[in-house]
Design a protein with these regions (language model features):
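Structured domain cores in non-transmembrane regions
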Residues: 484-554
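Long, low-complexity, Lys/Arg-enriched
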Residues: 116, 143-150, 154-472, 477-483, ...
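Conserved TIR/SEFIR loop-to-helix hotspot centered on a Trp-containing motif
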Residues: 74-96
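Surface-exposed interaction/ligand-binding surfaces
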Residues: 559-569, 573-574, 581
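Switch/connector loops and helix/strand junctions flanking conserved nucleotide-binding motifs
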Residues: 77-81, 111-125, 351
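Conserved N-terminal substructure of TIR/SEFIR domains
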Residues: 1-67, 90, 98-99
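Acidic, metal-coordinating catalytic cores used for nucleic-acid/nucleotide bond scission
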Residues: 19-22, 47-52, 74-82, 256-257, ...
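Conserved beta-strand/loop subsegment of P-loop NTPase cores
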Residues: 68-70, 100-107
Length: 605
């Protein structure tokens, strides 16, 4: 397959070549990671007849690509299409335009006997039968994507380096267009992002595109996308600053949580002269705006138990002192949790009250951006007021942050307001919530991410979205080293017998390393350093079946079907003889679970 058109296109997508049978899951993970960092991937996700796939690939190269990723998965040697068609195309494109077209090899083959190195000879060895020139791939830079194994192999991901190099190359190629120091970044949170323009309102020639996949059930971004955003965002921000970007324009549509994360990542204190958010109506909400007149004011309200709203008694637009906020929200009680909703007149009271109840009946503060209307009809907030409103709302949140250790925040206002407000809140610890579907037509606020200062990423935590299986479990299997006895408040105890042998115990694997001995109090004490790994063995999920495992195994795995003994019962001698209940941890989604060891840990409350 040849093309008369040059393969390189500075803002074109990045082609992902992979073996469908053995590499589809890793390819989706790579795609998700790159999308979260501003790069648009191109991969054919359908298992079609060869002719159709070949036409799709040909079209992709003819339209122009900015780079390619060759994924080496265990099983790629069985592929015919990758070594015969895609690999030669990628190598040819790189040779034709080495500066404009980057080729990255992501290697999942571990070097024999090494805990963290990849087998650099794998490209040639795996593809040489059907691609005689495959050995030249060994000379290309290879990045690691290694899962842990039962032989001491550690999990290693260098996708951050792949993203860094792709961003750096793209910004270098587009430097003539970025000469004024301004960059355009398209945004999209939709069910199935692809390599095509988001829609007619997202300009296809934007320099970068951040796209998060939307969960079909909850209608909010998927947990895996948030976790990839957590790692990708600091890489993106570092490259923007390295390219001396001074003005950022975001455009398109997205959920408030993405807008909040971007605002925290580019706070007013950083070297950004102008931060602009172009909404889906083409209005620019700029950090430098000064409105000709003000029609939107800030009203501080709370919710009564029946869901009705009640003003806190402060004059509109007044920013109360910390002492005034304390009295209004907590009275004489100590300031703990607080639920905050940034709204633009519209809100759903019941999900807010349900969230407050979960947080030990925390007070609810509604920061309502009310736009006056002479005739009583709905009037939209003027975009030129956004910067000033964001600054004042940020001041209110900072005063709340001085009182409560943690703010629980949701936004029911334009996404631009979430971003402009967040730029003044990068020093606060905030748990952000999205209003999502939970089934049976019920809407509730779902905690999705945490932002706080002083860390490598503005997103310091992503919360699990796995569906609990408590209602589905009909049988429990004990996989701990000992019998587990349940002591109910009334009735006879019940015991789950221990497995027959230790090969069935679900335990966290570990590697040991002898260190120099401690010399204390005239004694020499040996010291062993323990490196924790994944759990093994891993029982297969089965409908209606739950597993009782050690607590540390449940915390490591984050599976919805893992339970552990909780609420200890002690015998007369003081030893533990059973439990009062079973415990479980928040479960990560099915897409996250295989990659949790390569991502940041679940935050602790």
């Amino acid at each position: 397959m040849t093309s008369s058109r040059p393969p390189g296109r500075g803002n074109g997508p990045v082609f992902i070549s992979y073996h469908q049978k053995s590499g589809a899951a890793d390819a989706e993970f790579i795609e998700t990671y790159l999308r979260a960092g501003g790069i648009v991937p191109w991969r054919d996700i359908r298992d079609l007849e060869a002719g159709t796939v070949e036409r799709n690939i040909t079209q992709a190269f003819e339209e122009g690509l900015s780079g390619g990723v060759l994924l080496l998965s265990d099983g790629i040697s069985e592929s015919s299409f990758v070594p015969k068609t895609e690999a030669p195309l990628l190598v040819g494109a790189h040779k034709a335009d080495p500066d404009g077209f980057q080729l990255h090899i992501i290697n999942t083959f571990r070097k024999p006997g090494s805990p963290d190195e990849c087998d650099i000879d794998a490209p040639g060895e795996q593809l040489k039968t059907k691609y005689p020139e495959a050995e030249q791939l060994n000379d290309h830079l290879q990045r690691r994507l290694l899962h842990s194994d039962d032989k001491g192999g550690k999990p290693v991901s260098e996708l951050n380096l792949v993203l860094r190099d792709l961003l750096r190359n793209r910004l270098k190629v587009r430097r003539p267009q970025l000469g004024d120091g301004e960059i355009e970044i398209g945004l999209q949170t939709r069910p199935e992002p692809n390599h095509l323009p988001a829609d007619s309102r997202t300009v296809p020639e934007a320099d970068l595109h951040i796209r998060l996949r939307q969960d079909a059930a909850t209608q909010i971004p998927e947990e895996l996308d948030y976790r990839c955003l957590q790692q990708a965002l600091p890489v993106l921000i570092d490259e923007l600053h390295a390219a001396r970007i001074r003005r950022v324009l975001f455009r398109g549509g997205c959920h408030p949580s993405l807008a909040w994360a971007l605002g925290v990542a580019l706070p007013h204190a950083r070297e950004i002269e102008r931060f602009t958010w172009r909404d889906t109506y083409g209005k620019d909400w700029a950090s430098t705006d000064e409105p000709a007149e003000r029609s939107t004011s800030i009203h501080l309200e709370t919710l009564n138990p029946d869901g009705s709203r009640r003003a806190l008694g402060f004059p509109r637009d007044k920013i109360p002192s910390g002492a005034e906020l304390r009295r209004a929200l907590w009275g004489d009680a100590p300031a703990k949790n607080v639920v905050v909703l940034l709204a633009a007149d519209d809100l759903r009271p019941q999900p807010l009250l349900a969230l407050a109840k979960k947080l030990d009946d925390a007070p609810v503060l509604v920061i309502n951006l009310h736009t006056l209307s002479a005739d009583g009809a709905k009037k939209w907030m003027d975009h030129t007021e956004g910067a000033g409103l964001g600054r004042r709302v940020g001041e209110i949140l900072r005063r709340l942050g001085d009182l409560a250790k943690l703010l629980h925040l949701a936004v029911s206002a334009p996404a631009a307001m979430a971003a402009l407000t967040a730029r003044w809140c990068n020093t606060l610890t905030i748990d952000f919530y999205e209003l999502g579907n939970t089934g049976m037509g019920v809407r509730e606020y779902i905690r999705v991410l945490r932002t706080e200062s002083g860390n490598k990423s503005p997103i310091t935590g992503v919360f699990p979205q796995g569906v609990p299986q408590v209602d589905e479990v009909r049988k429990l299997i004990n996989l701990t080293p000992h019998d587990v006895t349940y002591y109910p408040e009334a009735g006879e105890p019940f015991t789950w017998a221990a497995p027959e042998g230790p090969d069935q115990w679900v335990r966290r694997q570990e590697q040991s390393e002898e260190l120099p001995s401690l010399r204390v109090q005239g004694r020499e004490i040996p010291v062993t350093r323990i490196r924790q790994g994944t759990i093994a063995p891993v029982p297969d999920p089965m409908p209606g079946v739950g597993y009782i495992v050690p607590r540390i195994s449940a915390e490591t795995a984050r599976r919805p079907d893992f339970f552990f003994p909780h609420g200890e019962v002690r015998g007369q001698g003081g030893g533990i003889i059973g439990c009062r209940r079973l415990g479980c941890f928040e479960a990560v989604s099915n897409k996250v679970r295989p990659y949790l060891e390569l991502l940041d840990p679940v935050p602790q409350d």
